[in-house]
């Protein structure tokens, strides 16, 4: 558990969380940008569903899909807007709790119409991106760096793209956002020294290349825990589950987020008077019971405890059980308990990501998820358990690659009328299969796909 926690530390957003009134104004802007009737109270990003055996026939064989690695980082949207009062461009990151963080230091230009000097004269306004904030290991310096990997675009310069197919959204992302950003860094590096982190487009492959992508996961400069299958022609589902958007994980990577509650034993000191408040005290030398609670829905009024030595009292438990119920116990060894104590951090009430041990069936902790206010809803937990029981292995996926390619070719031939002409989705995908700023090269056939800009590492 301890080693897993150290390697799975989630990155922190390098920004300032915005107060309620500012956040509300920003939510209204996003609402109007996405043509929503009213501001959503939840994260406006789409949510994938867990991969099941039935998805092979019903989805992967029936529709064109992209496949990419599933980054194990921090899912955030990036909202870029010009302040109507000051005229200054602001960059905000939206986490899964729908908090808005102001990230200073960036400048995002529009695509120049005639000359490169326009990169210094024009600014993005009303652009909403989807991606993952991740900690990467620089292969040159071996130092850890923060990077934002973009994989979708909900709006570009005030134009809502959610009803456009994925292929079109990615084309807009590459041409109208990433290219001018990349060109600005290349042409005017002295103007980019304040950028708090680097940005890349996540590499997309056709679904029949899933084996190549899966076998590249351990070669990436960041943690990855599976694959994402995105339908080529589907619109973007903002603020909810997308039944066509699939996440595949190896069985051992299927995880659940629980609320952690510690039952710390109390002992009596008979040497103290019976009316002494210190006669009974918590015994931290004895390992407590680690209970995992699953969220039933509703607002969680319990806040994470500020002090380690203040477990939940009876009243707090009563409040907790309005929205949570005990699901299981966490397996913690004596050594792991000592390591947790050495952290000198609050433990009670924190959200923890856990995996089920395939051999023992015990739940083991991977990391704290302080980016989440609640654990997974009970319905999500049920889906994850079903996914574990109905797990699709990489070997299972390898066996259907030929069928996926055959179905692709049949659809391509049917839409082209047998003329052999490439489909629009094919040519559009080709513009996105390279992380270079020139978006006209065909998908790479390299054994190790390029997920980031290699010339980006040295600066």
Swiss-Prot record:
Taxonomic superkingdom: Eukaryota
Keywords in alphabetical order: GTP-binding, mRNA capping, mRNA processing, Nucleotide-binding, Nucleotidyltransferase, Nucleus, Transferase
A GO MF label: mRNA guanylyltransferase activity
Stored InterPro entries: mRNA_cap_enzyme_adenylation, mRNA_cap_enzyme_alpha, mRNA_cap_enzyme_C, mRNA_Capping_Enz/RNA_Phosphat, NA-bd_OB-fold
Biased composition regions of type Polar residues, renumbered to the chain: 424-444
Subcellular location: Nucleus
Activity profile over pH: Optimum pH is 7.0.
Region (Disordered): 415-459
An example Gene Ontology CC term for this record: nucleus
Catalytic activity: a 5'-end diphospho-ribonucleoside in mRNA + GTP + H(+) = a 5'-end (5'-triphosphoguanosine)-ribonucleoside in mRNA + diphosphate
Disulfide bridge positions per record: none
A GO biological process held by the record: positive regulation of transcription by RNA polymerase II
Active-site residues from the entry: 70
EC number: 2.7.7.50
Extra remark: Present with 279 molecules/cell in log phase SD medium.
Protein family according to the UniProt entry: Belongs to the eukaryotic GTase family.
Quaternary structure and partners: Heterodimer. The mRNA-capping enzyme is composed of two separate chains alpha and beta, respectively a mRNA guanylyltransferase and an mRNA 5'-triphosphate monophosphatase.
Purpose of the protein: Second step of mRNA capping. Transfer of the GMP moiety of GTP to the 5'-diphosphate terminus of RNA via a covalent enzyme-GMP reaction intermediate.
Name of the protein in its database record: mRNA-capping enzyme subunit alpha
Gene responsible for this protein: CEG1
